[in-house]
């Protein structure tokens, strides 16, 4: 049974112009307010622009890639950022990392690996869409702790898409949005489980060591965070389920006897698995060779094309360049400008005094909430560079173990669920067009507090048991 498609081709021209006018009016109104003490004129201009852009993010009067082009142009025209610095964000290493992971997933699909994965999951879940979603989100979410959240998300989506299309789950449908939002959310939540699950974890550990000399090893981080990961992944999935209430009558098409039969891997599948394994080895040994993740994954793509696993023209045609470069790159440029304009530092100076002198739990929640909100707008490296130099000395001054602050930075930023640009898995899933950015925000407003509640519960129970607090 197919669901009725809920979204059309987009708002009418009249509605688009009205939404743009509302966005511009809000931005002008905020800019006309007196500049608060401690905030520069440039920072004030940035916050006014950000307010206008947030309305466009949520209403999409024009496609989101175009909104992010408007963002870059505005940063330059209004003097918030220099031309080269702004456009450099659109070519950030993380952009190429996102592109590379998308391409790896496309290659995995073309050689049949994602189809094999989808059939493997169906054997154990049956055709029920809800059960399939829960098992795949749980498996890929927990796997994200070891294989990087964006890679797990991209491979999972490519395995799920053919099943969704065959079942008649349309773009814009409630069930389609549920499937395509719950997976990146769960992969992001799972990424907190170990140091290699996401760059945010390693950045937080590195800042802690630089500022205090305290080292968090791979095993330390796993002991602190992996139990929370095991609880957060299903909790976030359930939050998405409550928001979208997917149609329980929809089922995937059952496997034929031939499809159920286990077949040996083809030569191309084995070649692809070998290259993917090399890429993951590169991820795990990054501290030894020092190469960026983008270099590792793009090197894998070069190797895949070189050995004939995929035709470049097919790879070029299937890759969502605009979403990766314009949406995620634009988000990085916008986040960088938040730091250089002084707006981020001002917001931190307003926010953190509320949590001073109130103990480790208040500091944990304060750092975590602020970090989770900020990482929706700026890269986690930039957020860590802003927050940890303020929060770690504050923790030491109050007699709180600074490790708690670093863990909060890495773990709470796993819930960047409010905007598409918040984290790479969101961008990857959005690129397939199954949901609007406003739908992701709607789900994030529920899933984000649920994930945070899990982390607070973990701190009050597990961290006390192991003696971290």
Locations of regions flagged by a protein language model:
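Hydrophobic transmembrane alpha-helices of multi-pass small-molecule transporters
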Residues: 1-97, 212, 220-349, 446-452, ...
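Membrane-core helix-loop-helix motifs of multi-pass transport proteins
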Residues: 7, 11-12, 167-246, 426-459
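Alpha-helical transmembrane segments of multi-pass membrane proteins
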Residues: 129-144, 169-190, 216, 220-221, ...
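Membrane-embedded alpha-helical segments and adjacent helix-loop junctions characteristic
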Residues: 8, 35, 52, 65-66, ...
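C-terminal transmembrane helix pair
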Residues: 170, 226-227, 330, 334, ...
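Re-entrant/interfacial helical elements at transmembrane boundaries that shape
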Residues: 72, 150-164, 180-181, 193-211, ...
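Transmembrane alpha-helix interface/packing and boundary motifs in multi-pass membrane proteins
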Residues: 54-63, 139-149, 184-196, 282-288, ...
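Alpha-helical transmembrane segments
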Residues: 93-103, 145-152, 187, 221-237, ...
């Amino acid at each position: 049974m197919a669901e009725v498609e809920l979204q059309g081709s987009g708002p009418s021209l009249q509605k688009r112009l009205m939404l743009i006018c509302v966005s511009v009016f809000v931005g002008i109104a905020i800019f006309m307010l007196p500049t608060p003490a401690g905030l520069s004129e440039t920072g004030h201009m940035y916050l006014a622009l950000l307010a206008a852009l947030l309305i466009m993010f949520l209403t999409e009067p024009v496609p989101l890639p175009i909104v992010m082009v408007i963002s870059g142009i505005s940063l330059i025209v209004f003097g918030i950022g220099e031309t080269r610095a702004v456009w450099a964000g659109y070519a950030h290493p993380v952009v190429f990392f996102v592109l590379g992971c998308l391409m790896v997933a496309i290659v995995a699909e073309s050689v049949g690996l994602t189809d094999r994965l989808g059939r493997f999951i169906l054997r154990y879940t049956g055709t029920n869409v809800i059960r399939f979603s829960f098992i795949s989100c749980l498996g890929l979410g927990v796997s994200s702790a070891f294989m990087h959240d964006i890679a797990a998300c991209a491979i999972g989506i490519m395995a799920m898409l053919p099943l969704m299309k065959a079942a008649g789950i349309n773009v814009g449908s409630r069930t389609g949005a549920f499937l395509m939002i719950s997976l990146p959310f769960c992969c992001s939540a799972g990424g907190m489980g170990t140091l290699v699950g996401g760059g945010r974890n390693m950045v937080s550990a590195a800042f802690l060591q630089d500022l205090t000399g305290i080292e968090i090893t791979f095993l330390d981080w796993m002991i602190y965070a992996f139990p929370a990961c095991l609880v957060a992944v299903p909790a976030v999935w359930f939050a998405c389920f409550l928001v979208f209430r997917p149609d329980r009558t929809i089922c995937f098409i059952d496997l034929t006897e031939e499809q159920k039969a286990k077949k040996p891997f083809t030569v191309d599948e084995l070649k692809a698995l070998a290259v993917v394994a090399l890429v993951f080895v590169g991820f795990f040994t990054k501290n030894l060779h020092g190469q960026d993740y983008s270099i590792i994954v793009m090197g894998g793509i070069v190797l895949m094309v070189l050995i004939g696993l995929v035709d470049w023209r097919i790879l070029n045609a299937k890759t969502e360049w605009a979403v990766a470069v314009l949406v995620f790159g634009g988000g990085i440029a916008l986040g960088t400008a938040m730091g250089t304009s002084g707006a981020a530092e001002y917001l931190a100076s307003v926010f953190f005094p509320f949590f001073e002198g109130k103990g480790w739990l208040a500091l944990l929640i304060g750092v975590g909430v602020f970090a989770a909100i900020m990482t929706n707008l700026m890269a986690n490296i930039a957020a860590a560079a802003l927050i940890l130099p303020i929060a770690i000395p504050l923790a030491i001054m109050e007699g709180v173990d600074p490790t708690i602050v670093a863990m909060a930075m890495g773990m709470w930023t796993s819930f960047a669920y409010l905007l598409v640009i918040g984290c790479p898995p969101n961008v990857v899933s959005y690129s397939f067009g199954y949901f609007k950015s406003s739908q992701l925000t709607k789900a994030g407003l529920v899933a984000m507090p649920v994930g945070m509640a899990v982390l607070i519960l973990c701190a009050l129970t597990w961290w006390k048991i192991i003696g971290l607090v």
